[in-house]
Amino acid sequence: FEVTEKMIRHFVQKVHNNRKTLVRPRVLIAVPSGITQVEKRAVRDSAESAGAREVFLIEEPMAAAIGVDLPVQEPTGNMIIDIGGGTTEVAIISMSGIVFSRSIRIAGDEMNEAIVNYIKKKYNLLIGERTAEDVKIEIGSAYPMKKRMTMEVKGRDLVAGIPKTLIISDEEIREALTETFGTIVEAVKIALERTPPELAADIVDKGVVVAGGGSLIKGLDILLKEATGLPITLAEDPLSAVALGAGKV
């Protein structure tokens, strides 16, 4: 609660150029679709304690869909996958409402943790989360690439207790992330199974849009296309999709 309050207070002060005068803005916060009413209340309370005059919540997949310009108000089916840092949001949207959504706590942070654990288990090398993030961005992939990629990784040898450097490949990182990608694919399949037939027909025609930082993983669109048989489109500005959508509301 306190951490959330401090974060929101920092954002409010930053927007208002750190003015010392009392500013009580209206605040719109994007939250995961799977959080409970208690968690929503906690977010509201944190924002109000940080000085917000009014607090509005919008579910992240809806914000992402608006941010990538999906026709959410039309009576047709739209599917959005938002792979963020803490959660992956999968949603079917129609007529300004979420018909079905699934939120899983498997996303970018989980990928970093999987990379750390894989290298620790295979090489007895302990690397930091920042290094794991760099590895994920540089050579992480969800599908075999045409060109083999490698990267130098530095960490601490857990046996000798001294710094050590090794070379890892994209194939190894793909192996490390297999379970994570599998969980995301399963969530997508469940959403498709729960989609009403008339909306499913729209999604078959229009395909699926993927947003969030996780969508930048190489080959993810190919993996999802093979798993679902649907056209997959990556958002033009995936990192800002939720923020852009919230700004349009």
What feature does the model see in each segment?
Residues 1-83, 91-209, 215-249:
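Nucleotide/phosphate-binding catalytic cleft detector across ATP-hydrolyzing
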